[in-house]
A protein has these predicted regions:
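Hydrophobic, proline/glycine-rich low-complexity stretches
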Residues: 1-5
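Rieske [2Fe-2S] iron-sulfur-binding domain
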Residues: 8-135, 350-384
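C-terminal catalytic domain of Rieske-type non-heme iron oxygenases
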Residues: 39, 118-384
Length: 384
């Protein structure tokens, strides 16, 4: 698991100014709430007084109130009031980590890391969200799998033929399967997008709704370790529209064996409201087929070395993803989960926030990370 990237915290409707919203990421507790202006905030969910969960308390005047002794924390993570001190100022050490927040696509995201704003990898920009001619459906998927396994599944086009027989597209011909995927590097990730076979028969999902020139293309890419994109194009209509599904997966690694996926499914065809349920049924059938595989992988986590698997040319996008993970490990961003597990229960940990670069004297320990390379690789550049 990696610090210094954007992670989904909860749906916008789950984060309120009335009740704190608790969530676990990397096996660590976080709390989200809104201030009096409706702005969302995300803090480490451990009161530095005696270790209580702020998420078990309540929100008052835009502050998270600890249920144990009433300590009040503002959106910046500073304790602004200690009831037992009366009007006296709380100690300077009375603070918890507060994380940068963005609210997009009906989801609250937090940047879990300490990089300054100018150096942060971006949150993926879904340009068509909210645009005329596009429709969005959002799903929350609770999956008993490691999040990297889920991302790698999305970067694997060959499994479609075997796991999703009714999907129709994308299907790779034997000739394509023998060739390495045409993977290119993009900022903070890698990508493939290419023509595919489109095998239609009477059982193919949504086949009867397709019309126009067949221009089947599909591909997937990732941005960071936990943001996955899949585009599937079908036909070109008389007005020049390319009918497509654009699917976006924002993955929340709860722990090493559980993932909460925020799945944004967008389409520019089948736009009638009466078709929403049919599209949803087909979509969730495909999702369920993937989950059935992911929840039964051995080992649960991605192998530490590619030599522990027999990889094929069609796995090139998976290999490229793992190369990116190694680069981020070289930067010192890979959480040492073994060291963390060893000390959890004896100490309280937090993902370091940007404020730690400006001040010291923090009570919560920063999560241990694996040592980075002596010289980190430069940021991944876009391919012209």
């Amino acid at each position: 698991m990696y610090i210094n990237f954007w992670y989904p915290i909860g749906l916008s409707k789950e984060v309120s100014a009335e009740q704190p919203f608790r969530v676990q990421i990397f096996g660590l507790p976080f709390v989200a709430f809104r201030d009096d202006d409706g702005e969302p905030h995300v803090l480490s969910d451990t009161c530095v007084h005696r270790g209580s969960s702020l998420g078990s308390g309540w929100v008052k005047n835009g502050r998270a109130i600890c249920p144990y002794h009433g300590w009040e924390y503002d959106g910046d993570g500073r304790c602004t009031r200690v009831p037992s001190l009366g009007d006296s100022k709380p100690p300077a050490r009375a603070k918890v980590d507060s994380y940068p927040v963005q609210e997009k696509y009906g989801i609250v995201f937090a940047f879990l890391g300490d990089l300054p704003a100018a150096e942060r990898p971006p949150l993926y920009d879904v340009e068509e969200f909210g645009q005329e001619g596009w429709k969005a459906q959002t799903y929350i998927l609770e999956v008993a799998c490691y999040y990297q396994r889920s991302v790698e599944n999305g970067l694997d086009p060959i499994h479609n033929e075997f796991v999703h027989p009714l999907q129709g597209a994308p299907m790779m011909t034997p000739d394509l399967q023998r060739k390495p995927l045409p993977v290119t590097q993009i900022p903070w990730g890698s990508k493939f997008f290419m023509p595919f076979g489109d095998r239609l028969n009477a059982d193919t999902a949504l086949a009867s709704e397709r019309s126009g020139e067949n221009v089947a293309k599909a591909g997937s890419w990732h941005q960071g370790p936990n943001q996955l994109v899949t585009w599937i194009q079908f036909t070109k209509t008389d007005d020049g529209t390319i009918t497509a599904f654009h699917q976006y997966f924002f993955e929340q690694p709860i722990d090493e064996g559980h993932t909460r996926i925020f799945f944004l499914n967008m389409r520019n065809w089948l736009m009638e409201d009466s078709l929403d349920q049919r599209v949803e049924d087909v979509t969730l059938q495909v999702v369920g087929e993937d989950i059935g595989i992911l929840e039964n992988l051995n080992p649960v986590r991605t192998p530490e070395s590619n030599t522990k698997e027999v990889l094929m040319p069609g796995d090139q996008a998976v290999v490229s993803y793992r190369d990116c993970l190694k680069d981020w490990e070289n930067r010192g961003w890979h959480v040492d989960m073994q060291a963390l597990r060893k000390r959890q229960g004896a100490a309280a940990f937090a993902i370091p926030c940007p404020a730690r670069r400006e001040s010291g004297n923090w009570v919560l320990e920063a999560v241990p990370t694996l040592p980075g390379a002596d010289e980190a690789q430069p940021p991944v550049k876009a391919v012209s």
